[in-house]
Amino acid sequence: MKAVLTCFRPVVASHRRYCANPGQAMKYLNVAEKNDAAKTIAGLLSNGAAQRREGYSVYNKVFDFEAPVRGQNAKMVMTSVSGHMMQLAFQVSYKNWRTVDPRSLFDAPVKKGVGSDYEPIKRTLEREVRGCQGLIIWTDCDREGENIGYEIIDVCRAIKPNISVYRATFSEITTVAVRRALQQLGQPDKRQSDAVDVRTELDLRTGAAITRFQTMRLQRLFPEKIADKLISYGSCQIPTLGFVAERYKEIEAFVSEPFWKIKVLHTIDDLTVEFNWARNRLFDKEACENYLLLCLAEPDPRALVESVTVKPKHKWRPTPLDTVEMEKLGSRKLKLSAKETMTIAEKLYTKGFISYPRTETNQFSKEFALAPLVEMQTGHRDWGAFAQRVIEWGPNPRNGNKSDQAHPPIHPTKLAENLQGNEARVYELVVRHFLACVSKDAVGSETLVHIDIAGEKFTANGLVIHERNYLDVYVYDKWSAKQIHHYENGQRFEPTEVSLHEGATTAPPLLTEADLIALMEKHGIGTDATHAEHINTIKERGYIGVLDKGFLVPGVIGMGLYEGYDAMELALAKPQLRAEFELDLKLICQGQKDPKVVLTEQIAKYKQAYQQITDKITAMDAKISARINETPAANSAVQEGADGSAPSHGIIQSIFQCPKCNEAPLALKPKKNQQGWYIGCNNFPDCKNAVWLPTECKDASVLDECCPTCGDGYRMLKFRLSTPYYRGVFGTPSGWYKTCLPCDNLFRTTFNINLDSVKKVGGIVGEVRGGGGGPGPGPGGGGSGRGAGSGGWSSGPGGGGSGGGGGSGGWGSGTGGGGSGGWGSGTGGGGLGGGKGKKPGGESKKSATKKPPNEPKPKKTKEPKAAPNKKTSSKSSGSIRSFFTSAAPTNSASNGLDEFFDSNDGFEDAMLAAAESVESSSQPKTISMVPLDDDIAAAFAADDDAEFEALVNGGTMPTESNGDQQLDKSLSEWIKEQDKADERPMLWGTRERASLGTAAPTPPPKPAAKRPRWDSVERDSTPPSSVPESETVLCTGCQQPARQNTVRKNGPNLGRLYYKCPKPDECNFFQWADEPPSSAKSKNSTGSAPQSTTSWGSNRVVTLPSIQQSNSQRGQSSMRSNSSSTVTITQTKTKQQERNTATPGDGEEVMCNCGQLASQLTVRKDGPNQGRPFYACPTREKSCGFFKWGDEDQNQGASSTSWGSANRNPPGRSQPTAITSDGPKTRRCGLCRKEGHTRNKCPRKDEFDM
């Protein structure tokens, strides 16, 4: 143990040296809100030793110094921003006023990004943060400052995601305050930042929507007076305008009334005392005259003094200064606007002369040190003496009742004697107010004298000031003494004058900025920090004006807007709506409300208000017209939309939510050349999802009608088809076609529109999203989710895919569930897509929507389920013919194209019937699935080993359903007689099938084996090969079991299996897994029938992917399978033309196997066989399986069939293309394996990237 500890000690020591790194000091990036603040803070922390250098912004310098942080010396880099660095804005798609419906701005995506003017600041932060280990935020300690701090954090963490972030909390920029903040670093408050984000987004959405609507409308209606004006709306601006407009309307509506009152005067030695009538005034002159006659009834009227009262009187000193009071004092005493006052105060704060000017607190805490601040002012020539008196009294502030728990009241932080202009005036106001609030009240005495004349009461008062106290320094308050004669109780005197005086009522005065700020604070409009901004904004808009004496009057347009909102009975002009929102913001800061919930609720309220505006907009038109004296334009009613909005021509029309970004809707937009249409995401450029409509679609528009299948939010698309061919395809003789892209499979297939561009489909892009089947000779598992599930990669029954589509019958043979039949033989389900499985005997269910009785219950998925369009459901049910062929003229004379495409001609049944006798192991029983999380694991959950053994050994299967009793007879007999499928590759065709019957004698039956189970852990196995599973491939050099590998390199052999030497010092052994060894080849060449050749692919056996491939490989294979339902083979133009013109027999009738005249059809699907004629059974319901190419020699028979056989490429594998001698090889895409483009320009590149 001692030896162990001895060895462990140096490791611990080295670890401590690595972690602590005491030789290197920490380096912090400090960021302030303004350059002046950064300069001052750097100077205070460094004792004036900070070194200045330039940043990318010429207005924001960088300062380097050292300072102790939490007891350890650290390197400091101080810089600054210039207020908000990021701006919230709509995406580019919403910038054009004329093409965007204002209503859509309530839900349009917004993005917060750094403005172009602030890029140099951003670059400075990015450069400096790279060499720092910590970030300290020194912005103002309020909501806005916290939000600016998080903007800084976002920029810095984009460069260094794990950087430590700290918050410096301070209320003044003094040496004591900033050093204390540096030693008591905290964390930023995300709640305050969230409150600002909510307010910013709501103001942006509501302001932009209503502003655009009323601006475009009023400009159109009144082109002479408002053509070039912006008629803006703001949730704080309009209520603020309402206060001014209401006062102005009160004055307009005021009617003056005359009144009369009795006045009594008593003069002694040039001192006149006026006694006020207890009745004040009367509006009835006759009654007032009667009272006067009553007082004068006696020839010598005498006044009797009833009481003389003397009581002390105090004039209260002011409470500490907060932001609102400073703005009001600046307006009333300094005649400065609120905006000017706040701008000057912020400058004084950044220079360190006063504390933070944005505060709601008007009380000093008991712990606040007032004496040093007062003593600091004793050296001033104007108020230094009074400050000394306050020191002698002891500072005693008169506190108010408000506190924001963040900042103290506004107070001076240091003496300033060299300020000039308005800065000196504002600084003087702050200092005098501070000294006054911590001094004493003024003290005096008030005398009240009550007299009686003939029963009428009169009163006079006087004031004597004993101690002025705070009035000596606070020159903004006046308290004048009022002298009065000496009176005693019971004294009688003769009044000098008793007379009747006439007056009239006057209207209330216009509002001043101080009055307006008081009203905004009372009703909760804005905050102490935003009052000045709101007032200044409506001034700049021209909604209000300022008269010479500072009185505010509404402008012409401002009054029209207020009256218009009032006529519409709209709450937007009232303060209640905004006051509720301001209260919610406070609750967000306190953590009592969710920001997202508040934003959603407020947007819903403003949506209702917007709807009310559009419904009653004519009321505003009338009010605006009356105020500006202009008649609305005559043609405006014709041009405007139904809701009073601008003309809809050119408006971008939203269709449904983008499935890729889920942040903005897809919208119908004209192409740049105005020659067509496309559907693009409004979240561009962040989302580049787009669907380019073909040129055949003319006059496209978006209907208000929603899709009945997809539901609300999915609007229908309407356009006119320009060509007769597509009119016939879609069954619209008039050419007008209405569709919903997510559920119209026919439209997407016809014009090659990717499903994932219009619908959220999940990880594997495409319609077929089933899971894979089982490995080896087991039954295939059903795929979960919408789309078809693939069956087993090898033999075994294919399980039906749960959800909207069926499962393919398996890459080998098998009894398929619903969906497409297998690429091999067996009783696989017929048709691509959602067709039901084929009954024994070649019967196929026509219905595409009804599930098989034994289909497993679908597994729930998150993807939205969209049923197919009713108009195209039958066409998407799985008929191969509906995709590749159209009826010949002889058969389509009585039936239109619509009827033909809606029919099931049994072509897929013919293909499956022709492949029934392929030699592959199959099991005539569909194993029920249990829904599991893993689709493949669900397919192999059932323990069916006993059934599998009984099937392979020819035993009897237990009867469980009617479907089990209707097994294909030929398949059952073949299973009992032979087991050659394990020795030979699976082929699909006619001549190959015939050759298999005579190639070799039937080997003895093999002992039954347990079905291999799928390993849920190890999935990196390989596809099945031509080598039987019971045999082991030995290396020819070392005679050891060879190692099986898969080709990973892109090319014609991608995914192909091969064997090589397993030893590290490999020998030269190599063998393809899907090709027999050289001995087998030579034996086959001498003893077996020759293999037939077809025009599809090469002659070699095609290998198939294993069920145990990785998920990514299986996803790519599925995508390749979805992209092409047939194999693309390079053909020369000459041979293609020869096939199109050659017909067998030149007029001879072709009969099918059931004795009827065969139907002559033509391949319509794009591909090497497009336009090629062929014959098939005319019976669509019960096809005999007859098929024959029309351009091939009759003597060739079925051996020349290009459908099926092992030459056909299975989905998911990229096979070498057969190149004819008549033409060169055409280059293909490395992703989708189609010609005409490369992988860089592949239209499906995004699918394969996933």
Swiss-Prot record:
The gene is Top3alpha. Residues 27-171 form the Toprim domain. SMART domains: TOP1Ac, TOP1Bc, TOPRIM. It comes from Drosophila melanogaster. Zn(2+) 1 binds at C1035, C1038, C1061, C1067. It comes from the Eukaryota. This is DNA topoisomerase 3-alpha. GO terms for biological process: developmental growth; DNA recombination; DNA repair; DNA topological change; double-strand break repair via homologous recombination; mitochondrial genome maintenance; tissue regeneration. Its EC number is 5.6.2.1. Residues 769-835 have a biased composition (Gly residues). Releases the supercoiling and torsional tension of DNA introduced during the DNA replication and transcription by transiently cleaving and rejoining one strand of the DNA duplex. Introduces a single-strand break via transesterification at a target site in duplex DNA. The scissile phosphodiester is attacked by the catalytic tyrosine of the enzyme, resulting in the formation of a DNA-(5'-phosphotyrosyl)-enzyme intermediate and the expulsion of a 3'-OH DNA strand. The free DNA strand than undergoes passage around the unbroken strand thus removing DNA supercoils.
